[in-house]
Regions:
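Extended alpha-helical targeting/anchoring segments
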Residues: 1-255
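Single conserved hydrophobic/aromatic residue that forms the stacking wall/gate
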Residues: 253-256, 260-263
Length: 263
């Protein structure tokens, strides 16, 4: 299945009150996953394309029709153009006030970390998939995604695995500690050394590793750190990355979504 879980969906898994959105335009479901009948899988490393069809009992196959559609090069392309000014749901001062409030909660010990977001709005004309293609070119991260759900689209580029469950093992790769790439190897090495010794970046990384261990331990045993504060180089930045893994309890009887529910 493919889809998403929003932050507000925490209300279904934990006893945490969540305020409903006051934005009438924000009517996307909080959780949406789809089992697609047809998949087209691209393997860029092998220059291969695989067509997958989920075929029910007694259903005819349409894989040949999909293959013909894939080979049809007669398609229309559309440009993308921003229209008007960029706006936000929060003013600069409102956002700064939220930051000050978040810092106060951290100092009181109410929370370990708060991730404050701010929505920006930009009207446009044309095909937003063109914008996604530009993002993919500028920031080629391990997790690139574009979902067209009809009434809304979601796309982005992320280096981070929230949780991976494979062959009886669940893993989380905490990423915290970031600095820029310079384009010069020696300068990048110096920036990496500075990153590894930066007290603030290291404190944040240790906190996320501890959170990952705690989250996995809620539903796994043999939770441990596989590697710790490994510098990883991306197109524009250098990240510090660790890996925490564990074995889900009664894995043969446990579905993946039950492990994810605890994360």
């Amino acid at each position: 299945v493919y889809g998403y879980t929003t932050f507000n969906a925490i209300r279904y898994f934990e006893q945490i009150p969540v305020k409903d959105s006051r934005d009438p335009k924000n009517d996307a479901p909080e959780i949406l996953y789809i089992l697609y009948k047809y998949l087209i899988v691209f393997n860029d490393f092998k220059s291969e394309m695989v067509l997958v069809e989920f075929q029910g009992n007694g259903e005819p196959s349409h894989i040949e029709e999909i293959e013909k559609a894939v080979n049809n090069r007669n398609y229309t392309t559309y440009a993308f153009r921003a229209v008007g000014e960029t706006t936000s749901t929060l003013t600069d001062e409102e956002h700064k006030a939220n930051i000050r409030k978040g810092i106060a909660h951290c100092l009181r010990g109410d929370v370990f970390q708060i991730v404050l977001s701010r929505r920006f709005i930009q009207r446009y004309e044309g095909d937003d998939f063109t914008l996604y293609r530009a993002l993919r070119s500028i920031n080629p991260s391990p997790y690139l995604f574009y979902f067209d759900f009809g009434g809304f689209r979601i796309f982005g580029s992320s280096p981070e695995t929230h949780c991976k469950i494979e062959d009886g093992k669940a893993t989380i790769d905490p990423i915290a500690g970031t600095t820029r790439r310079s384009g010069d190897k020696k300068t990048d090495e110096a920036l990496t050394t500075a990153l590894l010794t930066d007290p603030k970046e290291n404190a944040e990384h240790v906190m996320l590793v501890d959170l990952a261990r705690n989250d996995l331990s809620r539903n796994c045993h043999d939770t441990h750190v596989e590697f710790y504060k490994e510098p990883q180089y991306y197109s524009h930045v250098i990240h510090l990355v660790s890996r925490v893994s564990g074995t889900p309890v009664s894995y043969t009887h446990l579905r993946a979504h039950e492990t994810l529910r605890h994360l």
